[in-house]
Amino acid sequence: MTKQPEDWLDDVPGDDIEDEDDEIIWVSKSEIKRDAEELKRLGAEIVDLGKNALDKIPLDADLRAAIELAQRIKMEGRRRQLQLIGKMLRQRDVEPIRQALDKLKNRHNQQVVLFHKLENLRDRLIDQGDDAIAEVLNLWPDADRQQLRTLIRNAKKEKEGNKPPKSARQIFQYLRELAENEG
C-alpha cells in the first residue's frame, strides 16, 4: 500500500502529542545580545572591585581566575578577557553574584550618607554651639560634652583666624567614632 500525499504528515514524530507545557519561547537575537552585553557590564563591575570586595562575592574557581587575570591585563587584552568573563557568566546563575554586588554598593552608599549627616552635624555644632551639643548628647549619651565644647571653641577660633580646620576635622573624627561605636 502506498501512502497518499496528505498522509505523509502523520509520520512526523511528536506531532500527535499536543502538550501546552512544551511551548517554545522565541527570544529575539537582539534580546540575546542585550543580555550578553549586560553580563559583560556585570563582569566589568566585578573586575573593577578590589581584592577584599571580590572575596565577598560567590565565584567559582574558573571565574575567579579569569577575573584576577583581567585585573592584571591592560587595553585590548582586557576587552577580550571581559568578553570571556561575560561568556562564562552566561553559563552560570548570576543572581547570587548580583545580590552580593548590590550589597557591596548599598553598604558604600549607606556610609556616604552617614558621612554627609556627620558633616552637617559638625557644621551645626560649630555654628550653633550648645543647642547642637544637646542634640549630639541625645543621639549618643556617652559623648563627652567637655571634649566637644573644647573642639568647637578651637574650631571657631580657627575659622575666625582663617587657619586650616584642624579642630573641625577632629570633631568629625569624634562624631564618626561615636557613630561606629553605636552600630
Curated annotation (Swiss-Prot):
The keyword RNA-binding applies. CDD domains: YjgA-like. Residues 111-183 are annotated as: Not required for functional ribosome assembly. Its main location: cytoplasm. GO terms for cellular component: cytosol. This is Dual-action ribosomal maturation protein DarP. The gene is darP. Disulfide bonds: none annotated. Interacts with RluD in late stage pre-50S ribosomal subunits. Interacts with ribosomal protein uL16 (rlpP), via the N-terminal loop of this protein. PANTHER family: UPF0307 PROTEIN YJGA (PTHR38101:SF1). One of its GO terms (molecular function) is ribosomal large subunit binding. Keywords: Cytoplasm, Ribosome biogenesis, RNA-binding, rRNA-binding. Member of a network of 50S ribosomal subunit biogenesis factors (ObgE, RluD, RsfS and DarP) which assembles along the 30S-50S interface, preventing incorrect 23S rRNA structures from forming. Promotes peptidyl transferase center (PTC) maturation. Binds pre-50S ribosomal subunits near the 23S rRNA L1 stalk, where it may mediate correct positioning of the L1 stalk. One of its GO terms (biological process) is assembly of large subunit precursor of preribosome. It comes from Escherichia coli (strain K12). It comes from the Bacteria. Changing D21A: Significant increase in pre-50S ribosome subunits. Changing E23A: Significant increase in pre-50S ribosome subunits, no longer interacts with ribosomal protein uL16. It is found in: Cytoplasm. Changing E20A: Increased pre-50S subunit, altered 30S/50S ratio. Gene3D superfamilies: PSPTO4464-like domains. Belongs to the DarP family. Has several regions, N-terminal loop (residues 1-25), a central domain (residues 26-105), joined by linker (residues 105-116) to the C-terminal domain (residues 117-183). The C-terminal domain is not required for function, while the N-terminal loop is; shortening the linker decreases assembly. Disruption phenotype: Slow growth at 16 degrees Celsius, accumulates a pre-50S ribosomal assembly particle, although some mature 50S subunits are formed. Ribosomal proteins uL16, bL33, bL35 and bL36 are missing while 23S rRNA helices H38, the L1 stalk and H89 (part of the peptidyl transferase center) are incorrectly positioned.
